[in-house]
Amino acid sequence: MPIWRFNGNTWSPNGPPPSSAEPFEFQTPVDMSKVTAALWPGQSRGGYKGHGGFRFDSSDADSMIVRAPVGGPLVQAARYLEGTEEQVLLFFSVPCGFFYRFDHVSGLSPKIEDALKVITGPATNDSRTTFMSPPLWVEQGEIVGTSVGIPPSNIFPNNVIPNPAWADSFANDKEFGHYGVCFFDYLPSEDGDLMRSLPTGKEGKTSDYC
């Protein structure tokens, strides 16, 4: 299966990409019955954020199974410190051309934990990624981690697809900032509708994508 790479200007696969099913739909990566609020993608939250996320009560964060929403290889990862808490950032490349990411995920599955042994750190506020060599394939529905977050416990999936209209908003982040989608649209319909109905952060239900 091809891996998508960024050359500083554009994304391209290292082989012929497969077509995706229409409509393209993810498996919801977490138990929606435990989600207490939604963070909408494409809004300012201490700076512009192209990603959104799920929020959980802290009592659930230590027992939250996180599953891969679609099959694809883990291609980049980072370990970093936020305060005194170690955080893990994971990037997955879906063969048909999507990227998604998880941040603040912990209790990693054994095979992902083993793959991340090549990463040095963690370092405070340094989330620069390491490319996985070789990439690690993770099947749809496979467990990625078993807990999430720092208070107030968030996990952030970031789905990447061309959206040139907003490129100027992300002048310093050509790799991911020029691309984004409303990930609610790619969840099973009932879960996407629930995300839209849940309470939000102080920024509310504003989004350049949704």
PLM regions: where:
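Surface-exposed, glycine-biased beta-strand/turn segments
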Residues: 1-89, 93-96, 137-143, 179-180, ...
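Short linear motifs in intrinsically disordered/low-complexity regions
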Residues: 8-10, 15, 32, 155, ...
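Residues in well-ordered beta-strands of folded domains
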Residues: 55-57, 103, 159
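Zn2+-dependent peptidoglycan hydrolase active-site motif and core
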Residues: 69-131
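Short hydrophobic beta/alpha edge segments that flank linear recognition/processing sites
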Residues: 87-93, 135-181
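Low-complexity, serine/threonine/proline-enriched polar segments
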Residues: 129-134, 184
